[in-house]
């Protein structure tokens, strides 16, 4: 048996399950799942500003024979045994403001801002209790966790839309053009600044970093490490604004993503015999800005900074001086100089541009052909590097949609 999970006899399930959906967020009734604390007094601590507890065998003399050590980290006889209990730590709230306006006929404007805050002990970063416990980013170990920023919260989001309708009649039949532009802006993710290795010796690489306020609070292995570290700190807004503090889990935010989507919708009213029909043709470009610049409308990643793990714990000064020493972690042999830099590729369906065309009538709504799907299927692959690639793909979408839509209309009229 690799793990044992025990429930406290008084444990209760949350009264409400949490979810986020634009302006509606329901928070758990202060009842998140966490592990019970294993109390042990007399723990040694590091010297200096970062004075977290030390579990390492090589740094801590063990007078308590009830605690065993294996290798270089603390090891209890009840391996991987966790106890589930309730906690009252944590809270959450959402505030939203939406403004709608119609300054002139047929012009619709909308602007909305949503702020969400959520603090919790655990966002359940694992598939079972033991992996969840091991996945917590902490200072003094996973048994000592305070409420911290929710792993999946989006603190700030702005959405807006502009819509304009141009109606006209032709031979007594209504025609109309709808032009719509949609905007969404948000930070694409929350990250934690942690050390690259296990500093406190508890056997888990989840130690949150201490952000020194100046050179007096941190010791480096080399002068080059020191210079590279402070250069990195000054370019990162979170590190620069939280000097002298421990990094909070998931509190560092990725740069904002600004995305625009465009829709053109045409209304066609026509008669077949004595029956009047309405036909709509919609043309959508998702993430239209990405057609202009490949770096627009997509999120950045933190691969260039080793996923925000920039400091490596190198040990202490001596057996009698438990002052930690660090080095600056190198990515591909070079010191990182940016936190976020590598753009996600167009393989990410949620980020790249796509075009879709949809036909619908008052009897049938059918056909949605996406340019993005054609890329996956390899259509027009011989023209992919051609400047006409986009227009070929668009022509294919429109013609296929119209033909399929008209055929569907014919079948509906004939009763097939």
Predicted ranges, named:
Residues 6-25, 86, 114, 118-137, ...:
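Primarily recognizes Gram-negative and organellar outer-membrane beta-barrels
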Residues 347-371, 375, 390, 394:
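Outer-membrane beta-barrel "beta-signal"
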Residues 93-97, 156-162, 258-264, 351-357:
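Hydrophobic, lipid-facing positions within transmembrane beta-strands of outer-membrane proteins
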Residues 4-174, 178-187, 406:
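Gram-negative outer-membrane beta-barrel transporters
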Residues 178-275, 280, 305-355:
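Extracytoplasmic gating/loop element in the C-terminal half of outer-membrane beta-barrel translocons
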Residues 106, 167-176, 269-281, 363-376:
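Short loop/turn motifs that connect adjacent beta-strands in outer-membrane beta-barrel proteins
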């Amino acid at each position: 048996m690799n793990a044992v999970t025990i429930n406290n006899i008084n444990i209760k399930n949350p009264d409400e399950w949490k979810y986020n959906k634009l302006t509606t967020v329901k928070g758990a009734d202060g009842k998140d799942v966490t592990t019970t604390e294993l109390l042990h007094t007399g723990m040694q601590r590091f010297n200096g500003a970062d004075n977290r507890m030390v579990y390492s065998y090589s740094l801590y003399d063990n007078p308590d024979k009830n605690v065993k050590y294996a290798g270089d980290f603390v090891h209890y006889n009840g391996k991987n045994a966790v106890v589930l209990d309730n906690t009252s730590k944590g809270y959450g709230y959402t505030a939203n403001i939406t403004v709608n306006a119609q300054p002139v006929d047929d012009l619709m404007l909308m602007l909305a801002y949503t702020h969400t805050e959520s603090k919790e002990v655990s966002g359940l970063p694992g598939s079972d209790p033991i992996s969840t416990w091991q996945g917590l980013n902490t200072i003094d170990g996973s048994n000592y966790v305070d409420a911290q920023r929710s792993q999946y919260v989006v603190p700030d989001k702005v959405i807006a839309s502009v819509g304009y309708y141009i109606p006209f009649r032709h031979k007594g039949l209504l025609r109309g053009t709808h032009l719509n532009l949609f905007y969404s802006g948000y930070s694409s993710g929350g990250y934690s600044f942690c050390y690259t290795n296990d500093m406190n010796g508890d056997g888990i690489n989840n130690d949150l970093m201490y952000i020194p306020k100046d050179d007096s609070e941190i010791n480096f292995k080399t002068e080059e490490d020191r210079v590279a570290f402070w250069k990195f700190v000054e370019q990162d807004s979170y590190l620069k604004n939280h000097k002298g503090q421990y990094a909070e889990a998931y509190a560092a935010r990725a740069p904002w993503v600004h995305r625009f989507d465009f829709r053109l919708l045409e209304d066609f009213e026509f008669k077949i015999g004595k029956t009047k029909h309405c036909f709509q043709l919609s043309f959508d470009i998702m993430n239209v800005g990405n057609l202009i610049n490949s770096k627009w409308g997509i999120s950045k990643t933190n691969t260039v900074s080793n996923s925000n793990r920039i400091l490596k714990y190198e040990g202490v000064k001596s057996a009698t001086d438990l002052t930690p020493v660090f080095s600056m972690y190198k990515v591909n042999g070079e010191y990182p100089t940016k936190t976020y830099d590598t753009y996600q590729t167009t393989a990410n369906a949620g980020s790249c541009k796509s075009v879709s065309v949809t036909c619908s009538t008052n009897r049938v709504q059918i056909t949605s052909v996406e340019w993005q799907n054609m890329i996956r299927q390899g259509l027009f692959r011989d023209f992919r590097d051609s400047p006409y690639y986009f227009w070929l793909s668009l022509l294919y979408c429109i013609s296929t949609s119209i033909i399929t839509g008209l055929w569907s209309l014919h079948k509906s009229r004939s009763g097939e």
